[in-house]
Regions:
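Active-site beta->alpha N-cap acidic-glycine motif
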Residues: 1-80, 84-91, 95, 102
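Catalytic domains of cell-wall/extracellular-matrix polysaccharide-remodeling enzymes
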Residues: 29, 51, 75-169
Length: 169
């Protein structure tokens, strides 16, 4: 079995760790920590942040993390035409493909904004979240930890951002 193959025991309590907007400057450190603890995450990447960080995207796949699409440059997709939405997703998938050898398997729309045009244009399962750490706002690692630990339940999907250094801390 390769490192990228992941066995999940669904009978055990678990949460999904998800990171938006990257890859960021410290995504490599985050991947090393996940690997150290045999943990995995889903990375919802902005296409514009992939150039120059292709090694991080490749490492995500190699360590069994899930590759997610978060648009090219984080627009409010509900305000775009179907063609522009498809371009946002397609361009990002192309960049992920070039870096990792496979495209995203899931998509998270920026701001969680979904309408019928987005639904019909994305072509991937859309994943939202149940706990928002607000790390983008607080920029405080302990605040994010407290938010999660105060509310976390089995099956939660936790939203963080790998572009903020405090989220990696």
């Amino acid at each position: 079995k390769s490192k990228g193959d992941v066995n999940i025991d669904a009978s055990k309590p678990m949460v999904a760790l998800t990171f938006d907007d990257g890859p960021g400057e410290r995504t490599g450190e985050l991947l090393a920590q996940l690997e150290k603890y045999n943990a995995h995450a889903t990375f919802f990447m902005q296409g514009k942040n992939i150039p120059g960080k292709e090694d991080f995207v490749k490492k995500m796949k190699e360590t069994g993390c899930e590759l997610g699409n978060h648009s090219y440059d984080h627009p409010q997709l509900t305000k775009l035409s179907a063609d522009k939405i498809a371009n946002q997703i397609g361009t990002t998938n192309d960049l992920i493909q070039q870096a990792a050898g496979s495209t995203a398997t899931v998509m998270r729309p920026p701001y969680g904004a979904i309408n019928d045009t987005v639904r019909s244009s994305v072509g991937l399962p859309m994943i939202l979240w149940s706990i928002d750490t607000l790390d983008w706002k607080t920029r405080n690692a302990q605040s994010s930890i407290d938010t999660v630990m105060n509310d976390v339940q089995d099956g939660d999907v936790i939203l963080m951002h790998d572009i903020h250094t405090e989220s990696i801390d």
